[in-house]
């Protein structure tokens, strides 16, 4: 998958120079590219309201981050559960109309979740960094900021709002960007969860130092098709290196039944990230119990 960071104009050659500048009317090739383009503009607006310097000053007074990886390794369930606080998605639209992030988060904790994931994207998932802050005030377990991270600014903002871990999506980041952002995350005492969708992306991530937690997304972000075989195939293909490096694997997307959970567990997943199948239930606590009945 190729992600262009900004919609380009056709290249223009002037003498021996070749110019290519952003085209505000360019069309994205797929939803992930559209999201990344939107993030470019969104972060620019955020910086206008609050500078990175001022944001970093706020971060210095934030409480220490909680041990996200430790919570997974000592999971209350097997595999460990990262339960997602999620109102909507591009593929499903609004998942829960009566969306109360704090109540949902508390129900997840009661059900035995080891960690929570909170969507902060507003345009495509109807989340917010304010929701992250509200959940942080209400629960004590570690929190993952589920965002499309392309700039350090977003990482500092997530830390200020209470995140203990940050999602990094390999598909939208160059290797050099991944390395740089991972270094920043570690420097703030947080855990990077690096998400992959293919064997090529997994190989890229395994070549980077500082990676201890890898998420395998079973959803094809171009077609939205879901296959749990993605988790099985990727773990099988690189199981020796994963074991040797002591890397924890999180299976993400498409887990709706005890049979699904059993499949990814037997494949070798240490944890699962589940949102839709829990958040749409009237009683998320009971939904967790039902799901882990395999």
Swiss-Prot record:
TM regions (residue ranges): none
Taxonomic source organism: Crocosphaera subtropica (strain ATCC 51142 / BH68)
UniProt entry keywords in alphabetical sequence: Amino-acid biosynthesis, Aromatic amino acid biosynthesis, Decarboxylase, Lyase, Tryptophan biosynthesis
GO molecular function, one term: phosphoribosylanthranilate isomerase activity
Listed EC numbers: 4.1.1.48
GO BP term (any one): L-tryptophan biosynthetic process
Record's protein name: Indole-3-glycerol phosphate synthase
Gene3D superfamilies according to UniProt: Aldolase class I
Pfam families, A to Z: IGPS (PF00218)
Superkingdom: Bacteria
Pathway(s) served: Amino-acid biosynthesis; L-tryptophan biosynthesis; L-tryptophan from chorismate: step 4/5
Family: Belongs to the TrpC family.
Catalytic activity: 1-(2-carboxyphenylamino)-1-deoxy-D-ribulose 5-phosphate + H(+) = (1S,2R)-1-C-(indol-3-yl)glycerol 3-phosphate + CO2 + H2O
Keyword Lyase listed: yes
């Amino acid at each position: 998958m190729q992600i262009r960071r900004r919609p380009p104009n056709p290249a223009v050659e002037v003498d021996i120079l070749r110019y290519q500048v952003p085209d505000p009317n360019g069309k994205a090739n797929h939803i992930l590219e559209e999201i990344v383009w939107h993030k470019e503009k969104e972060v620019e607006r955020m910086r206008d309201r609050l500078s990175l310097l001022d944001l970093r000053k706020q971060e210095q007074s934030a409480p220490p981050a909680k041990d996200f990886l430790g919570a997974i390794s000592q999971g209350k369930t097997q595999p460990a559960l990262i339960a997602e606080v999620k109102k909507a998605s591009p593929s499903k639209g609004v998942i829960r109309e009566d969306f109360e992030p704090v109540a949902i988060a508390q129900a997840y904790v009661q059900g035995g979740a080891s960690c929570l994931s909170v969507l902060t994207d507003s345009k495509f998932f109807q989340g917010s960094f304010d929701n992250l802050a509200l959940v942080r005030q209400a629960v004590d377990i570690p929190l993952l900021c589920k965002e499309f991270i392309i700039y350090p600014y977003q990482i500092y903002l997530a830390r200020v709002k209470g995140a203990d871990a940050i999602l990094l999506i390999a598909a939208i980041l160059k290797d050099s960007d991944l390395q740089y952002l991972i270094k920043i995350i570690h420097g703030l005492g947080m855990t990077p969860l690096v998400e992959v969708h293919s064997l090529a992306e997994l190989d890229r991530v395994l070549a980077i130092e500082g990676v201890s937690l890898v998420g395998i997304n079973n959803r094809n972000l171009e077609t939205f098709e879901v296959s749990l075989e993605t988790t099985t195939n990727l773990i099988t293909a690189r199981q020796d290196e994963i074991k040797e490096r002591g890397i924890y694997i999180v299976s993400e997307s498409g887990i709706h039944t005890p049979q699904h959970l059993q499949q990814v567990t037997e494949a070798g997943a240490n944890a699962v990230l589940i949102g839709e199948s829990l958040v749409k239930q009237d009683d998320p606590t009971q939904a967790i119990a039902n799901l882990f009945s395999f």
